[in-house]
A protein has these predicted regions:
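Major-groove DNA-recognition helix of helix-turn-helix-type DNA-binding domains
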Residues: 19-35
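Arg/Lys-rich, alpha-helical DNA-contact motif
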Residues: 2, 28, 32, 39, ...
Length: 98
């Protein structure tokens, strides 16, 4: 078995959700799924994001389209924060020359 892959069936059972929900997230591009002999597996690296999405959907009652928007905005925010850090470091470099 692959230690970096979690069976979608096991994830769904432990979170009491339908496997079709995982399929919907995959079809919308929110998560990646690896298929081994037709069985879906979720990469362990995506487990945190998948659990966050499950909470948004079931606990906060946000639909898949809303989750897509939130995930997109979070990625943009993270990208902007990284860019801001690069610019701050560059500014520090110029300020230290004086």
């Amino acid at each position: 078995m692959h230690p970096d892959l979690i069976p979608a069936k096991a994830f769904c059972a432990s979170h009491a959700i339908e496997q079709s929900f995982i399929q919907t997230l995959y079809e919308s591009g929110l998560i990646e799924i690896t298929f081994i002999e037709e069985d879906p597996f979720v990469p362990a690296a995506q487990l945190e994001q998948l659990e966050r999405i499950v909470r948004m959907y079931f606990e906060m009652d946000i639909n898949v389209e809303g989750i897509e928007t939130i995930v997109h905005l979070l990625h943009r925010l993270q990208s902007m924060q990284q860019e801001m850090n690069v610019l701050k470091n560059r500014l520090r470099l110029y300020e230290s020359d004086f």
